[in-house]
C-alpha cells in the first residue's frame, strides 16, 4: 500500500529541511499523542543510522515499530526504513526548491505486509484510504503552515 502527499511551503529549502530533520520535535509530538519513543542511536546530529523504537496503540492493539534513517541527503531527501511484526515500510521525504523562498514537500509511505494478519491490517487501511489520505493531507498542511509562520516571523 502506498500513500503520497505533497505540500508547497513558503520558505527556502534549507529552512524546510532543517524543520523536517528536527527529530526531537517530532519525538515530543509523538510522546504528547501517547506513543512511547526510545532513541536507539547515540548520534548527536541527524544522519544515516539515527533510529527509534516506538510503541503506540492502533486499532485496539499495542504496536511496536523500529524506524531507521537509511538515506540522508541535505537539503533534498531522507529515507526511513521501518519494521514491525509482520510488516515493513519505507517513508521517503523529498524536498524540491520551487524558488528561493518556496519549497515543495513530498511524502511517500509504502507498507508491505509479510503475513496474513498484516495483510488484513493493510486491507482495512485500504478500505479507509480516503479518510487516511484526507487526514494526512490536513496534518501535513498544518505542519507546513507552522513552518511558514516560523520562517515569516524570523525574516
Per-range role (PLM):
Residues 2-4, 62-67, 87-92:
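Short, surface-exposed coil-to-beta transition loops
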Residues 38-85, 138-155:
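Glycine-rich portal/gate segments that line the openings of hydrophobic small-molecule binding cavities
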